Amino acid sequence: MVCGARVLPWREEPTPYRVWVSEIMLQQTRVEAVKPYFERFTKRLPDVEALAECPEDELLKLWEGLGYYNRVRNMQKAAVQVMEEYGGKLPADYEKLLKLKGIGSYTAGAIASIAYQIPVPAVDGNVFRILTRVAADDTDIMKPSFRTLLEKELREVMQGMEMPGAFNQALMELGATVCVPNGAPLCEQCPWNSLCL
């Protein structure tokens, strides 16, 4: 991974399934809160087939405490779809990942780049913040047309990249630990501090 990166259970074995589970759990939930849920969930449901076949009451019990239960319901619907259409293996194709229930551009990008080394961006709020700060652009990062433009530009930069998953994870890590949203960013620790605001 990246020098100085946090040790996280989903990074130890970044299979498509484990990347998917972690990214869905991490939506609107802090990393430290997700760790024990991830461990318990993947121990009981180690693959797509187990998730697809899990009784709903047990599935919801495993998710209890994370909230936003539609996330796990959508995961199970997607798991059934993956079993039916892809033989239980998450597709190594960004566009096909996007067609799965509950998977948007960020999650599809994370799975494709981290698990399959496909050069597509995984752009979340942290990454948008980094890119706008480095570019000294004060455009509202919540503006959809601006987000689309940044994703397109990042996709172009990533073409031909040997380790797109590591690149995406490095950006995520930088945004979570150095180029933080609240409080003062730790600019002296940033590898891009000479280019930035």
Task: Label every PLM stretch briefly.
Residues 2-188, 192-195:
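Catalytic cores of DNA base-excision repair glycosylases
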